[in-house]
């Protein structure tokens, strides 16, 4: 029987990424997995937000989760981002999707033509 919480997703960022930003005056060491477990979510979108992370190490920690998605904002500009996600999904079957997050900042002033996204959805595993 499906449960509603099986449909909830949490947006995860590297621990401490938003310390002292957006009115958050305290420091947080909570990892994305800890946040998901605390909130009772079984699915997580991981968005590093410009932080260079050890993708494999995070994926190891995400093994208790039902589904994991990673930000692939730059996949239309650089196919290597999508290829890395596909390679990681071979070792971690709970990686089920890629997420296009924000199109602000650099992408707001240097938009990617929509046709560049056409080939992304045709990759199947």
What does each model-identified segment do?
Residues 1-125:
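Glycan-processing catalytic domains of CAZymes
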